[in-house]
């Protein structure tokens, strides 16, 4: 409004200026007052009175706070005192209780000490009683050689109204084995103790266990290792006697196991791989199966007591002169070395091949070697992976002749081999059979089988075995050196002509049977496909296979050498004439085989399927030439004949060449019937 008034008043009027001067003068006065007041305030703040007042106020406030905190602390301390008093009252109560606990502790300690003292006294008494028992047992007559520790002591038990103990049975059994001359033990109170004490005792023939069901026959040689059985034979003389028919079947396995252990001793030096399957065959499980087979095949009339057997031996069995163990071992070792020499080249060749393909061949090879060492079979193997050619137990025929010089020399060689087998059979004085259950079933048609209903008649086979040995002795001296020299010469010439065509899977030649390896290497056989049907199929289709036997050379793929062709030509002519005789003998054996157990036929069918599968496996790995010819030509079903003069591969030329010519078949039929 002043502006409006000023604007209204003209600038040149004196009132305006007067009013303006007044206002400015009042402004100056107010400013001075303000400055004075500020100076006074500053001075007051800088004075001591103000500072003292401020400190006083602060101290007063602090005093108030301290008084309040003191009050709070006093109340808190009062509470703490009350709590401590309560805790002290509890502690006093607990101290009174601990006194009672200490009293109980002392009482319990005294009781525990008393119990420990009583237990110590009882333990000393028990130890004294054990020592007294041992002293009493020693005074009662325990043998010093069979002294036992306290851990093996067993209390006496009452059995069948009599008081017995393990220690007394051990003493009785040890005294039973200390007889100065060879005896026969027919009671086994403890089989494990028998195994331990048999090494220091005399050699026994058999051990019959009298059980509640039947009288079974145990094999003597429980030792799996061949060295252990050989050491037993070196400690005591080996005796053998002419046994009766009922005893003979029980004792068939004894000599075979003894020879088998010695052959394992010689074979273990050549290859360690062959011992493990043979040990499995000699394991306790296989021996128990042997006992089951013996007990099932025997009848109630064959159950013999110990007294009956001893009386029967004294009456009708004069003892044979004992044979020194050293000579027996030397002859057996020599014969095993001569037999296993054909295997050296084949095993060396197969060692460089893959292990998968060697497994079936090694299995069949071990079965072949076991049959060589445990029976009197003449087995010739030229197989690779699965091929086994067997010619079981050929009998000698002095009147038989072959056309050609090579055939005559082969026949002489067979007679020499047969004589060695027969001599080893004569030393054992028993007809040996294969020890394993599978081998017994497989050779049931080749070995003499005694039915439960047959009467004991051992004179005829024993007499014929003697004639067999006598005829073989006549041929031994003159034939052995000549046949060895001729075969060495022929094989040396053949090795010189051998070409590079012969591969490791398809080449075929006769295996070397010489003991010396002077530059003569074994040839590698070809892969042949064999399928073995059962006996019933063989008899039904036997007459229709004559044409196949004559034309077998065109059906079997084989790489022939010159020496092999010469031997084949010399023998095929006579083989045709002998075919009809073989089928007649097969028909004659059908009636004999009809009485066999049904289980053997099932086993043969199983064996046929196994061999057929292995043959198909080996054919898949054969040479290209063999596979090509197998596609064009049908597979021949080779028959497995029943008697000893017919092997499983009767269609092969090698089997025809090595088989002796039997014109006198009546004696052989009587011998094995």
UniProtKB/Swiss-Prot annotation:
The modification Phosphoserine is found at residues 317, 321, 647, 650, 652. Coiled coil: none annotated. Keywords: Cell projection, Cytoplasm, Cytoskeleton, Phosphoprotein, Retinitis pigmentosa. Phosphorylation at Thr-379 by PLK1 is not needed for centrosomal localization or pericentriolar material expansion but is indispensable for spindle-pole stabilization. The keyword Hydrolase does not apply. Its main location: cytoplasm. Residues 196-207, 255-266 have a biased composition (Polar residues). Residues 175-207, 255-413, 432-480, 494-516, 613-673 are annotated as: Disordered. It comes from the Eukaryota. GO terms for molecular function: protein kinase binding. Residues 503-512, 613-625 have a biased composition (Low complexity). Residues 267-293, 303-316, 331-357, 471-480 have a biased composition (Basic and acidic residues). One of its GO terms (biological process) is spindle organization. It is found in: Cytoplasm, Cytoskeleton, Microtubule organizing center, Centrosome; Cytoplasm, Cytoskeleton, Cilium basal body. The modification Phosphothreonine is found at residue 379. One of its GO terms (cellular component) is cell projection. InterPro entries: Centrosomal_kizuma (IPR026742). It is linked to Retinitis pigmentosa 69: A retinal dystrophy belonging to the group of pigmentary retinopathies. Retinitis pigmentosa is characterized by retinal pigment deposits visible on fundus examination and primary loss of rod photoreceptor cells followed by secondary loss of cone photoreceptors. Patients typically have night vision blindness and loss of midperipheral visual field. As their condition progresses, they lose their far peripheral visual field and eventually central vision as well. Centrosomal protein required for establishing a robust mitotic centrosome architecture that can endure the forces that converge on the centrosomes during spindle formation. Required for stabilizing the expanded pericentriolar material around the centriole. Belongs to the kizuna family. Kizuna means 'bonds' in Japanese. Interacts with AKAP9, CEP72, ODF2, PCNT and TUBGCP2. This is Centrosomal protein kizuna. It comes from Homo sapiens (Human). The gene is KIZ.
């Amino acid at each position: 409004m002043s502006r409006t008034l000023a604007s209204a008043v003209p600038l040149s009027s004196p009132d305006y200026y007067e009013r303006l001067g007044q206002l400015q003068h009042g402004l100056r006065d107010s400013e001075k007052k303000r400055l004075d007041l500020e100076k006074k305030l500053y001075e007051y703040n800088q004075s001591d009175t103000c500072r003292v007042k401020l400190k006083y106020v602060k101290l007063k406030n602090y005093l108030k706070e301290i008084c309040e905190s003191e009050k709070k602390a006093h109340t808190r301390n009062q509470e703490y005192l009350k709590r401590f008093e309560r805790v002290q009252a509890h502690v006093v109560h607990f101290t009174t209780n601990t006194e009672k606990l200490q009293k109980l502790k002392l009482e319990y300690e005294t009781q525990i000490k008393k119990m420990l003292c009583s237990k110590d006294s009882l333990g000393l008494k028990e130890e004294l009683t054990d020592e007294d028992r041992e002293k009493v047992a020693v005074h009662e007559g325990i043998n010093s050689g069979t002294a036992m520790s306290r851990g093996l002591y067993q209390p006496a038990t009452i059995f069948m109204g009599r008081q017995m103990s393990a220690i007394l049975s051990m003493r009785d059994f040890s005294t039973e084995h200390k007889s100065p001359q060879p005896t026969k033990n027919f009671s086994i109170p403890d089989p494990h103790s028998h195994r331990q004490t048999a090494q220091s005792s005399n050699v026994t023939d058999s051990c019959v266990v009298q059980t509640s069901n039947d009288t079974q026959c145990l094999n003597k040689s429980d030792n799996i290792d061949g060295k252990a059985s050989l050491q037993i034979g070196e400690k005591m003389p080996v005796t053998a006697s002419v046994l009766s028919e009922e005893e003979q079947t029980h004792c068939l396995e004894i000599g075979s196991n003894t020879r088998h252990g010695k052959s394992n001793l010689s074979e273990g030096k050549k290859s360690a791989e062959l011992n493990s399957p043979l040990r499995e065959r000699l394991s306790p499980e296989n021996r128990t199966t042997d006992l089951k087979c013996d007990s099932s095949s025997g009848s109630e009339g064959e159950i013999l007591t110990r007294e009956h057997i001893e009386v029967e031996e004294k009456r009708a069995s004069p003892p044979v002169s004992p044979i020194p163990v050293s000579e027996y071992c030397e002859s057996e070792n020599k014969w095993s070395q001569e037999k296993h020499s054909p295997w050296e080249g084949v095993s060396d060749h197969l060692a460089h091949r893959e292990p998968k393909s060697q497994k079936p061949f090694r299995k069949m090879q071990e079965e072949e070697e076991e049959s060589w060492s445990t029976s009197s079979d003449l087995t010739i193997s030229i197989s690779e992976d699965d091929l086994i050619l067997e010619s079981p137990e050929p009998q000698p025929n002095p009147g038989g002749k072959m056309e050609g010089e090579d055939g005559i020399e082969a026949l002489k060689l067979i007679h020499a081999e047969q004589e060695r087998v027969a001599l080893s059979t004569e030393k054992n004085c028993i007809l040996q059979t294969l020890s394993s259950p599978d081998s017994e079933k497989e050779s049931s048609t080749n070995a003499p089988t005694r039915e439960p209903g047959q009467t004991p008649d051992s004179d005829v086979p024993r007499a014929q075995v003697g004639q067999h040995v006598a005829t073989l002795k006549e041929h031994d001296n003159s034939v052995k050196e000549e046949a060895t020299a001729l075969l060495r010469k022929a094989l040396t010439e053949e090795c010189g002509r051998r070409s590079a065509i012969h591969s490791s899977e398809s080449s075929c030649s006769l295996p070397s049977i010489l003991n010396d390896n002077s530059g003569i290497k074994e040839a590698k056989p070809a892969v042949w496909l064999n399928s073995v049907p059962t006996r019933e199929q063989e008899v039904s289709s036997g007459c229709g296979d004559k044409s196949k036997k004559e034309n077998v050379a065109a059906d079997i793929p084989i790489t022939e050498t010159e020496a092999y062709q010469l031997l084949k030509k010399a023998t095929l002519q006579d083989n045709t004439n002998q075919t009809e005789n073989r089928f007649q003998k097969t028909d004659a054996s059908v009636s004999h085989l009809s009485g066999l157990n049904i289980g053997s036929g099932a086993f043969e069918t199983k064996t046929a399927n196994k061999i057929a599968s292995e043959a198909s496996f080996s054919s898949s790995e054969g040479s290209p030439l063999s596979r090509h010819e197998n596609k064009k030509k049908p597979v021949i079903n080779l028959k497995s004949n029943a008697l000893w003069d017919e092997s499983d591969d009767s269609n092969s030329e090698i089997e025809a060449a090595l088989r002796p010519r039997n014109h006198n078949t009546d004696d052989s039929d009587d011998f094995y019937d």
